[in-house]
Amino acid sequence: MMKKLALYICVLMGMPSVFGQELQLPTGNQYLADSEFLIMPTYAGIGNNVRVRLSATSQWVGFKEAPDYQSLSGDMRLGNRSGLGLSLYNDRNGYTKQMGAKATFSHHLTLDSYDSHFVSFGISYLVNAFRIDIDKFTEAGRPRADAAVTDNRAMINHNFEVGVLYRYKGIFASLAATNILNKNKEMFDVKEPTTLRNYNLYAGYRYKRTPSSILEIEPSVFVQYREGDSRSLTDANVKFRWFDFEDYYWVGATARFVNDQAFKPLSVGPMLGLKKGVFYFAYGYNLNLNTIRSYNSGSHMITLGIDMFQGIGGCNCTER
């Protein structure tokens, strides 16, 4: 009921506050399931396989019309130094829905092969279809909140994403700008924000006591800044990965913060996963710590994957 009330308010305001959400996809923790390509175009083609990942997230379980998100992604090496990637997604949040895709090209350069010193560049083309189903705003026996709104609202957007990745031994740092093009002001209400750019930073360190150690510890941080409304968030993560030749399993934890509310986590949760042969599996749970926690039992994420067509490249700049 609270969610429906918020939607009615959006309708009464003429819809611009809802339309400001298009092309602003939810940032979940799917990237921690060895799926960095979802947030950084520069990771396309890093690895010795064609990597396919199917991921689904169900937020705020127990809350009616709660958001859910699904993605299917794949990336592969092209030649010895380049990569290609494709990601398809579906996002539903109450009575709004987004579907879209991104197609990515990346290129990887070696600065020093002996020290595993590399730099990568990536670019993605983005297409997004956004829709609001106003028919569901009306309850039995109640009129529509705004009689002037008589049809469903839908649009298609095109945009781009660019990024750079720096790697030195176990250190990695990647920066990307998403939705680099502004919207056409003539298509929207004067109050509609036209700047959709997001700036994403993903950095961390993979630590092994010795090169032959079976345990790897990976602390990392993800920061997102939205230029349009100056909002930003930070994920603080840690993963422990145990290797058994080419197989491995891992456990980890993540905490999300809104940056203007320091030291007050928005959500926390454990994660785990494994890679056995060509198959991959990961699961994550997030517990909300804000006021909505009383109305739901948390959020769940699951990732299934397969790594196909094993083949070692001719350049260690594409090794994971």
PLM features: residue spans?
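Positively charged n-region of N-terminal signal peptides that target proteins for export
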Residues: 1-5, 111-113
